[in-house]
Amino acid sequence: MLRAFAGVETLVLVFPFAPEMLEYADRTTRAAQAAGVRHVVRSSGLGASLASPYLLSREQGEIDALVRDRSRAWTLVLPGFFMQNMVDHAEPLRSTGVYRSARGGGRTAAVDVREVGAAVAAIARDPRPHTGASYTLTGPRAETDAEVVAHIAAATGRALRCEPTSAMDQRMALAAAGLPDWVIDRLASLDTMVREGEAAGVSPDLARLLGRTPTGYAEFAREHRAAWQA
């Protein structure tokens, strides 16, 4: 990895959602430091903090701390929940017409991951003005899962609905689907974060970086309506 980073001035770090992500971060930031990388742009996560009560946010905070401590210059990008998650996991809603949520009516200002990528690319092209900055990237509105499903219903013309489920029932459903415990624990921490209102904030940062209003869920649902068609 040290050889790979030789001569690199700006490094964009996006770690996979994997049990080893802290190990990956440790090795990567050490190598970047040793290679003399000038600026590290790190894609983190909403609410990332060493002091977070939520498991995944706390782990993201640990990685952010490594970036801050080992980088000559750094910028942190903290995106919210991705709109694309509803596309990637569209099957239950597509086949049953029902989306089950354990978020208790909590709101998220979901963001189009393509716009996160555009913002990160803009920073990486000219990182100096963003040195030491942390940007929270969200969509333009905070909405409940029921409101998101309503956007999808309007886009597809289907009778879709969101049904509440308990945190325990959600865990059991994820386990039955074959997800490992480490994934379930972290997804549960995100659901708790939403239920407790910690994901409902709307930040102006993405609009400033893009120079325009970010995509809303209604527009996104219209563009991707085929994913939820029966």
Which residue ranges define each predicted feature?
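Conserved Rossmann-fold cofactor-binding substructure of NAD(P)-dependent oxidoreductases
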Residues: 1-9
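Oxidoreductase cofactor-interface core, primarily capturing Rossmann-like NAD(P)-dependent enzymes
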Residues: 6, 17-26, 30-39, 45-161, ...
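Periplasmic-binding protein-like
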Residues: 12-15
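Short linear loop/turn motifs
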Residues: 187-193, 220-224
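Short amphipathic alpha-helical segments at helix boundaries and their inter-helical linkers
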Residues: 192, 196-204
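Amphipathic terminal alpha-helices
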Residues: 205, 210-230
